[in-house]
């Protein structure tokens, strides 16, 4: 909604990361060396800053790898987690763990950036909460990252973000906070709000009650 500038043609960090992970897994099946070369080329863009046409920026002094090379930065959590896992694939294949370590430092040292009242995740930089689908994805990806790093800050965050399962009141609180934050930060007029309500409120409430 006009809060960032994304200049075409632009590079998607998530697409680069998923492509690299796919190439590495395909290489394990057929041992074709050209696939690892493609994977490394896909990840090379993360060595360059957004200003230089790449996907690297900083968050509170730590390197951060973006899903979208925007100005200002979006800091989308799930995108950065997928990127970190692609860097882990790079490490397994080549032994080079510099990008993986750098991305983990950026995420773990800033994990409270995406933490809403120790109960839920923010989607990214602009003040609105993750949908329930993205929140569950964020939690699942953090579980994978914890299994790889054994970082207790990640473990504590996961445990906090799962606590909503235990309380109907917490589910109701998140339900209200989610729609308030999304309505406040992403919707520009009354018609958009009405469409948003019709499309998502009943579905989200049903999911929260079932979980």
Task: Please identify what each model-predicted range represents.
Residues 2, 67-70, 84-90, 94, ...:
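Long alpha-helical, hydrophobic tracts
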Residues 10-28, 74-91, 130-147:
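Well-ordered alpha-helical segments within folded domains of soluble proteins
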Residues 42-54, 65-89:
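Hydrophobic, aromatic-enriched interface-forming segments
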Residues 93, 131-211:
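Terminal, non-catalytic domain-edge segments
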Residues 1, 36-58, 97-119, 153-176:
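Long, well-ordered core segments of solenoidal/helical folds
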Residues 1-11, 56-78, 116-137, 141, ...:
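Carbohydrate-binding/catalytic loop surfaces
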Residues 2-45:
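Hydrophobic alpha-helical segments and helix pairs
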Residues 27-31, 47, 51, 91-95, ...:
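Hydrophobic/aromatic-lined pockets within catalytic cores
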């Amino acid at each position: 909604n006009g809060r960032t500038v994304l200049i075409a043609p632009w590079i998607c960090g998530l697409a680069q990361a998923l492509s690299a992970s796919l190439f590495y897994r395909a290489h394990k099946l057929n041992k074709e060396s050209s696939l690892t070369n493609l994977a490394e080329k896909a990840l090379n863009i993360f060595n360059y800053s957004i200003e230089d046409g790449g996907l690297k920026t900083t968050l509170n002094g730590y390197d951060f790898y973006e899903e979208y090379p925007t100005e200002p930065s979006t800091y989308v959590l799930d995108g950065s987690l997928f990127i970190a896992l692609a860097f882990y694939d790079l490490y397994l294949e080549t032994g080079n763990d510099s990008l993986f370590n750098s991305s983990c430092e950026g995420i773990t040292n800033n994990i409270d950036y995406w933490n809403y009242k120790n109960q839920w995740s923010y989607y990214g930089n602009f003040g609105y909460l993750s949908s329930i689908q993205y929140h569950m994805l964020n939690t699942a990806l953090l579980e994978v990252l914890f299994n790889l790093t054994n970082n207790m800050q990640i473990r504590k965050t996961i445990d906090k973000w799962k606590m909503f399962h235990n309380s109907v009141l917490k589910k109701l609180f998140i339900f209200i906070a989610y729609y308030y934050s999304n309505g406040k930060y992403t919707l520009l007029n009354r018609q958009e709000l009405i469409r948003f309500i019709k499309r998502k409120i009943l579905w989200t409430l049903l999911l929260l009650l079932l979980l």
